[in-house]
Amino acid sequence: MVITVDGPSGAGKGTLCYALAKKLGFSLLDSGAIYRVTALAALKTQEQGQSAVKLDDEFALAELARKLDIQFLPQNGEVQIFLDGENVSGQIRTQDVADAASKVAVFPAVRSALLQLQQDFAKQGKGLIADGRDMGTVVFPNAQVKLFLDASAEERAKRRYKQLQSKGIDGNFAQILAEIKERDFRDRNRLVAPLKPADDALLLDSTELSIEDVIAQALAYIESKTA
């Protein structure tokens, strides 16, 4: 069984998906992390200076994507992400990598290279929670349950700002908001697999909801679809 959760950055997909996976005993696929790992791998080649893969080189990026060794492993109550055996969970959450991932994700060849990798996750375990931008529309169009989680750009910027503050990192709210709006525009207007709800997805707006409310509504919907 596959449950897809799509939506823009900062809407709360990661928290919701982890809660659903834990509650239902399903595996978790964070497709955004896969694109971030691809971007990180490209940035690492640039740092090493050998066979550097540029972020505007679609086919070099696609070739790199096909060779990625990515694992999602639960550790200490969180899902840790490994690239070639190295835990890169922290590295892929930086703003530089996030921006690079959004640029990498616009290329059809890269999306095609990563499509099979993502679909293979559905073959593991009794079920899969798939977190992303096009899980319900492209990667798993026949998923039994589809959710689309959204929130206003302002609310998502507030959450990101508070998250940075909690980590002792200075953040500029206006800059964060501008970056979110720019990323939204790229994601919603790319030619291949643009960010949009599947026709048969439940729309959840988390702007005014607590995460507990979002989880409760999602679980109730899943139960209604699988009863």
From Swiss-Prot:
CDD domains recorded: CMPK
InterPro entries with a match to the protein in the record: Cytidylate_kin, Cytidylate_kinase_dom, P-loop_NTPase
Pfam families registered for this protein in UniProt: Cytidylate_kin
Binding site for ATP: G7, P8, S9, G10, A11, G12, K13, G14, T15
Keywords for this protein: ATP-binding, Cytoplasm, Kinase, Nucleotide-binding, Transferase
One example GO MF annotation: dCMP kinase activity
EC number: 2.7.4.25
Subcellular location: Cytoplasm
Protein name, UniProt field: Cytidylate kinase
Species of origin: Actinobacillus succinogenes (strain ATCC 55618 / DSM 22257 / CCUG 43843 / 130Z)
